[in-house]
Amino acid sequence: MTIVPKGFQFAVAAAGFKRADRNDLGLIVSQGEAAAAGVFTKNLFQAAPVLVCKELLGERPLARALLVNSGQANACTGAEGLANCRATLELAAKAAGVAPNDVLPTSTGVIGAQLKMDKWAAAAPLLAANLGQASAMDVAKAMMTTDSFPKLSAKAVALPGGEVRVLGMCKGAGMICPNMATMLGFILCDADVEPQAWQEILSFAADRSFNALTVDGDTSTNDTVLALANGASRVSAKDAKSLKLLRAAVTEICQELSYRIVQDAEGGTKVAHITVRGAKNNAQAELAARAIGNSPLVKTALFGCDPNWGRIVAALGRSGADFAPEAVVLTIGGILVFEKGQPSPEDLDALLAPSMRHQDVEIVLDLCAGRGVFTLLASDLTKRYVEINADYRT
């Protein structure tokens, strides 16, 4: 049974945005005012709900409800799209019994189409009737687009003042690169925490999870992770020790969700754990890891269980990271593959074959140039990925 923080209710409805036979609208409502935090896409084309969320959080870092629809991105929809987004806040607020500026909206789906406001108007009363009847799992399912399974993670955390609960849910399977691409995530907590500290916790966790994965190198217009902490547990998280424990818990949940996103990559069969260490700094390590994780040649080698280490080294060499090639050490699955500018003299194909057949493949590069380190989760690239995205709108 999923651990659910105190003071939250859930609702879902089938609005028919994409298909008539599935829930595609979700609502999460806090019983009281909650500290609210958000992290968003860095794409310059930002969807209407992203712009509205940023505006609302900029005015006051507090909220009562989170709203999500799947099937319609409401991105690149101009002034009409913004007006429609604000209209959905009115509808959701009425369903939740809160003020419109207490609702933070999110959307995912096809870019460029206006929201079907007639369907929104018809579905809002269904949300109201379902509030408190649905579960967190129901909302996680309603968020899905090309995902093959819902993604939830939760845990109880013992703080000095007592136990609090943290629940995370997300959707995402394609167009995933840095900054939560086509990825929506919600983090719920019942600790009593100040809004600024809550934002710092979310930003810290996102940098070590949702911003450290890649499926296909594309960054969406709608990336959003929102977090609410409503204090319903009556346990304070305002001292340094409590904040550190809470930050660790939120980070762990976000990392678990990130792993599940890559695990569920469209058509994916592998999760590559790419660690670059010994870089001049962390930024250089990230640059190198992303070049490898986003390389189509590396990804297709992973899919084919091909221990083609040359593709990894070639991607590293064009990454822009500063290092001496002769100093690089590469291991795959713990097996030494490359050092001193040349491959290991062992029969690498035979040695690496078992590791390459695993779902999780560990790739570690030491640049021997400093103390920078970065770990990236990356998927492979398969025929099924091409089929899913070729047929996405048909």
Language-model features, listed with the residues they occupy:
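A structural signal for small-residue-enriched, beta-sheet-centric alpha/beta enzyme cores
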Residues: 1-90, 94-394
